[in-house]
Design a protein with these regions (language model features):
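Internal, conserved structured core segments that host functional sites
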Residues: 151-183
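Conserved phosphate/anionic-ligand binding catalytic regions in large, soluble enzymes, centered on
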Residues: 206-207
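Catalytic cores of Mg2+-dependent Asp-rich isoprenoid enzymes
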Residues: 2-15, 23, 29-132, 139-150, ...
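A contiguous catalytic/ligand-binding core that recognizes phosphate-bearing ligands
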Residues: 183-193
Length: 333
């Protein structure tokens, strides 16, 4: 049976109205924390910036493309923080045991603390991020949370509910959008809420995208409530990773949650945000494009089309930057 992602604007608005009060809380670090910009001389070398740029281009290509639509003076900050995220992801994926991963996360916590001193840890990434902190007043909260949430996810192993994944996305993945907003000089409640919702969609995409690899390793990142709801037989999938009708239903359900958030951002938060926030919020475009490819693959995460880079992302980023939104009339039916 062919399925379509939910694009009904009334359903999107209903979800947003229902959760608006929670999203507009006063506990936003961006609203509460204001860093004073330092006049310290930059410590990063041109080779440090190039190292970060190449690391992001190789390991996070879609978001590298997003960075190219940001004002030139902000790109180094974006590359530095994205490069830091690449290393944090590697810390969880490449270490052979949890203790080794904890040691690497401890190193990154110390590194983050050093970024707010005059003597940052001397690595290319830390020097570039240090300069971003000093130049743009990047909140310490986002960088600390980036480290802590990656470690928490490693130790938690699985998520009990879809709501847990959404909360994780708001905390972990949105921490990559918030600093970009700060580098753009945007301190705005609506833009912050947009970043949270984009973070949810990013987490949904990442969890679905990793399914083929994780199932082959005897793991599954789908929240347990969806697995139970759709009666997914994980033991069978661990032995023979493949698409089953039950897995397809669960993936469809999960993907729709992420896609609804993106439509909600474009419909509600983006029009209320400063126009200067758009370069950071364009992080939604690659996620939307991937989820729509998943839809064309009939929600089969094993489809090879999902593992390849899409040439459409660059064009859609350009179009969204020109129109001021990533929604098209065809997004609703």
């Amino acid at each position: 049976m062919n399925r379509c992602l939910v694009r009904n604007p009334m359903r999107t608005r209903s979800w947003l109205n229902g959760s608006l009060q929670a999203c507009l809380g006063t506990n936003s670090p961006t609203a509460a924390c204001r860093q004073k910009h330092s006049l310290q001389a930059p410590v990063a070398r041109p080779s440090d910036v190039e190292y970060c740029r190449l690391l992001v281009q190789k390991n996070d290509y879609d978001n590298y493309l997003v960075s190219l639509f940001s004002p030139k003076h902000t790109r180094e900050a974006v590359w530095g923080i994205r490069a830091m995220n690449v290393e944090l992801v590697r810390a969880g994926e490449t270490t052979t045991n949890d203790m080794a991963a904890r040691m690497r996360y401890s190193y990154w916590r110390d590194t983050v603390n050093s970024l707010y001193t005059s003597s940052p840890v001397q690595t290319p990434i830390s020097r570039v991020v240090h300069d971003a902190v000093q130049r743009f007043g990047i909140s310490r909260t986002w960088l600390r949370r980036l480290v802590s949430e990656r470690q928490n996810a490693l130790e938690q192993k699985t998520f009990a509910t879809s709501a847990d994944v959404e909360s994780y996305g708001e905390r972990a993945y949105a921490c990559l959008v918030h600093p970009h907003l700060e580098a753009l000089g945007v301190r705005d409640m609506h833009a912050d809420n947009a970043a949270r919702a984009i973070g949810v969609a990013m987490a949904v995409m990442a969890f679905i995208r990793s399914l083929p690899l994780l199932l082959a390793q005897g793991r599954c990142d789908l929240p347990r409530d969806l697995v139970a709801k759709h009666k997914v037989d994980l033991e069978d999938l661990f032995d023979h990773p493949r698409l089953t009708p039950e897995l397809q239903d669960a993936v469809y359900d999960f993907a729709t949650k992420g896609y609804t958030r993106l439509c909600g951002v474009a419909e509600i938060y983006l029009p209320s945000s400063p126009s200067t926030a758009l370069p950071a919020l364009l992080a939604a475009v690659p996620v939307q494009e991937w989820l729509e490819r998943l839809e064309r693959a009939n929600f089969d995460p094993f489809d090879k089309i999902l593992q390849r880079r899409s040439l459409r992302v660059l064009w859609r980023l350009w179009a969204a930057s020109r129109r001021g939104t990533w929604l098209q009339k065809s997004n609703y039916h």
